[in-house]
Curated annotation (Swiss-Prot):
Catalytic activity: D-glyceraldehyde 3-phosphate = dihydroxyacetone phosphate
Species this protein is from: Chlorobaculum parvum (strain DSM 263 / NCIMB 8327) (Chlorobium vibrioforme subsp. thiosulfatophilum)
Protein name: Triosephosphate isomerase
Gene Ontology biological process: gluconeogenesis; glyceraldehyde-3-phosphate biosynthetic process; glycerol catabolic process; glycolytic process
NCBIfam families linked to this entry: tim
UniProt family annotation: Belongs to the triosephosphate isomerase family.
Catalytic residues identified in the record: H96, E166
Length: 250
C-alpha cells in the first residue's frame, strides 16, 4: 500500500516572517490531527532553515524547490544539495514546469540534479508534464515518457523517488485535468517505470498530481488508483485550503 503524499510548493511567496507564521499554523494542525498521509512544505531558500526549525517536531517534511548539480563553486545564485541537507531538507522538487519553461531546464539538466540530490541522500520529487500545445497535438505520453526516461537516466535506485505529474496548462490557470485524464497519464508513468525498474518498483512508486488542486477537487483526484497525493501550489498558501486537501488525502 502506497502512502499518499501531499507537498505544498510555496514558490516565490512569503517573507521569512510570513513563512514562519504559515509553517507554524500548518505544523500545529498536522501535529494535532496526525493525518495518515505524508505532508511536506517547500518554502523559499531564505526561509528554509527557520521553517525547518518551526516544523521539526510535527512530522511535516521540509522540501526545497530546486538545487544545483555541483557541490560548490562559481555558480552565482545557486544552492547545492549539501547546503539543502545541512539546512534540514529531506525532499527537493526538481524539473518543475516553471523551471523548464522559464529557466530553460532540459531533461539532461534535470537528470544531473536528480542524480546529485539522490547521492546526497535527499528524496526527489521529479516533475513531469506536457504543455497545452503538446496535449492538443496528441503527444502527451511521448513527452511525459521522455521526461521520465531521460530524467532518470543512470539512476539505479528509485526507492526514495516521487514523481509529480503536472500538466503545464493546468498550473496556476484554474484549469484542472479531469480525474480520468490525470489517471491515464499516471498509469502511463507507472507503466514506464515498470519497464525501466520492474513490477515491484512500479507498484511502490508514489505519483502525485499537481495542477490547480484545491479542496473542491482533491478527493476525486486522490481516489484514482494511480494518484498518490498532490504537489500543491496556490492552495498551500492558505492554511484551511491546504489542510482540507491533506484531509482528502487521508
Amino acid at each position: 500500500m502506497r502512502r499518499t503524499i501531499v507537498v505544498g510548493n510555496w514558490k516565490m511567496n512569503n517573507t521569512i516572517a510570513e513563512s514562519i507564521e504559515l509553517a507554524t499554523a500548518i505544523a500545529e494542525k498536522v501535529g494535532a490531527t496526525k493525518p495518515e498521509c505524508e505532508v511536506g512544505i517547500a518554502p523559499t531558500f531564505p526561509a528554509l532553515h527557520e521553517v525547518g526549525k518551526t516544523i521539526e517536531w510535527s512530522g511535516v517534511q521540509l522540501a526545497a524547490q530546486n538545487c544545483h548539480y555541483e557541490n560548490d563553486g562559481a555558480f552565482t545564485g545557486e544552492v547545492s544539495t549539501r547546503m539543502l541537507a545541512a539546512a534540514g531538507c529531506s525532499y527537493v522538487i526538481l524539473g518543475h514546469s516553471e523551471r523548464r519553461q522559464l529557466f530553460g531546464e532540459t531533461n539532461e539538466i534535470v537528470n544531473r540534479k536528480v542524480k546529485k540530490a539522490l547521492a546526497e541522500g535527499l528524496r526527489v520529487i521529479l516533475c513531469v508534464g506536457e504543455t497545452l500545445d503538446e496535449r492538443e497535438a496528441g503527444v502527451t505520453d511521448k513527452i511525459v515518457t521522455a521526461q521520465v526516461v531521460e530524467g532518470l537516466a543512470d539512476v539505479s535506485d528509485i526507492s526514495t523517488l516521487v514523481i509529480a505529474y503536472e500538466p503545464v496548462w493546468a498550473i496556476g490557470t484554474g484549469k484542472t485535468a479531469t480525474k480520468e485524464q490525470a489517471q491515464d497519464v499516471h498509469a502511463s508513468i507507472r507503466s514506464t517505470i515498470e519497464k525501466l525498474y520492474g513490477d515491484s518498483a512500479a507498484r511502490h512508486l508514489r505519483i502525485q498530481y499537481g495542477g490547480s488542486v484545491k479542496p473542491s477537487n482533491a478527493a476525486e483526484l486522490f481516489a484514482m488508483p494511480d494518484i498518490d497525493g498532490g504537489l500543491i501550489g496556490g492552495a498551500s498558501l492558505k492554511v484551511e485550503d491546504f489542510m482540507a486537501i491533506i484531509e482528502a488525502a487521508g
